[in-house]
Amino acid sequence: MSAATLASAITVAAGVILTGGTASAANSTLTVNVASPFRPVSHVAAGGLYALAENNRPADNMLLPLKLNTLTQPAPRVGQRPNGQPPGGDALLVAPQATRVGAAEYIRMPDIYPNFPYRWVSWNDWLAKVDTQVNDRLAATGTSNITGWELWNEPDYTWDTAAAGDFNAAWVRTYQRVRARDTLTPIVGPSTATYNESWMRSFLTHARNTDTLPDIICWHELQTSANVAAHIANYRALERSLGISARRISINEYATPTEIDQPGPVASYIAKFERGGVDNAERAFWYEYGTVNGLTTNNQPTGSWWLYKWYGDMAGNMVTTTPRAQTGLDGFAAHDPTRRIVHAVFGGESGTNHVRFTGLSSLGGQVRVTVESTPASGRHTQVSAPTTISNTTVNVTNGELTVTVPNMSATSGYHIVVQPTSGVPGYQQRYEAENASIFRANRFGSSSASAGAYVGQIDNTGDPRTASYVDFIVNVPTARAYTMQIGYANATGATATHGLAYNGGSWSTVSYPPTSAWGQFGATVSTTVNLRAGYNVIRLAKGAPYFGGGTGYAELDYIELT
């Protein structure tokens, strides 16, 4: 059915989109509770393994709209030849581009070897390669986006016990070797191919007993999303049973070879990662370097790219979504309380299905509802735009609205935008600090903050590789000078300063006069930034490469561009 025909089959009455005809009826319902925010938007699953090939592939303009969180890239001096391709994607060589688009990087250390599964040589060889990688990274004083050393990859599949000995003991040797040179960069692992409680228990127990626990726990989800929630719950219970403090979770490979190019199943993974509190997740690598694993083809978007563009458009807070089951229809949603816009992205089911929104009272009694879809185009087919299914004004009853979408394909992705019929700014003006790319600082909650959260512990270690900064990816309609208002708190009793730079340009200084208390907001300062039309990256830094460092301390609530 064409988009026009499908749209004509939809009638709106009493706040419900009613479908005509006899579409096949899956009749699943995904519930979105807009009044139940559970974490700031941080686009945790917008990332990829071997996502970048060089310093410009894919092009920046294809990456900025996606608000990339974390990438896992091969080791410095990469030797890995996946699928027979020449080595590429060296984490340090692509770091300038990753930085330009706001993305953090993990370094996958065993990818210094050419083969997969890795072919063990000797302990002398491996430890020398570890030293080389760490030394290369430490010498890269202009690189500040490296946020993890991944010590090995899929040891439950690739570790050669006969030649190299027990993996748990090997982990300790490698961990200690890295820490002998780099005491600050987080360590990521064990990065197993699958989640297995018995395997993980053995690893964690040994790591706990040898004081070599990873800072970030990592495993892969490559066998559908049905068990993701159970795996996360099992891991958290395992931590508690072993007396281990909660670690950040990274799923740095997700989706099967078939699913990776299907927006519907991918939406289900993202939903479960968001609800499960995962820190970051990366699309699995199955085919080619430098496409974010099928999101781009010849620097043009595929169908899957649009799913991540919808994800990138989210701001404010993720809100609770409840599927009927762990298989089939699922999705994720966000509410931007400043603009009063709700985004929901979903898929994984065919036929006629429903998305029920509750907690919409803050949007008013009448809203505009837009429904879009994007197909499973495959990784080599360009999709120039999503298909608009409907764009309608709808009444909201008791804060509720149900959108019925007929003729869904289980492989396609779907997007619903709910917003007031008037009063929405023509472009996003306020950008919450907690939604930005945050390096070595932390998110906190506060009832006085703009959207209930802010960024604090913005520090300067004296080393630009490991100091704190916040990168705001903004999108403006025209090239001109914008007034940038910054919401902040500074309870030091004296003026604090940050460095300000945008689009990699020169540094200036922002001064923050003292305020009454930490975590209490309302104070603002303003400055001017000259931005190009489209996407820009604005950095506020306590410390960063090529910046001498800020003074005092300030917490960031938001920036606003007018």
List the model feature ranges, each with a label.
Residues 222-290, 295-315, 350, 362:
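Catalytic-core region of carbohydrate-active enzymes that cleave or remodel glycosidic bonds
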Residues 540-549:
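Short beta-strand-plus-loop segments that form exposed binding edges in beta-rich domains
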Residues 502-535:
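Extracellular carbohydrate recognition and processing domains
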Residues 55, 115-238, 242, 255-269, ...:
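Active-site cleft segment of glycoside hydrolase catalytic domains centered on the general acid/base Glu
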Residues 1-7:
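N-terminal export and membrane-targeting signals
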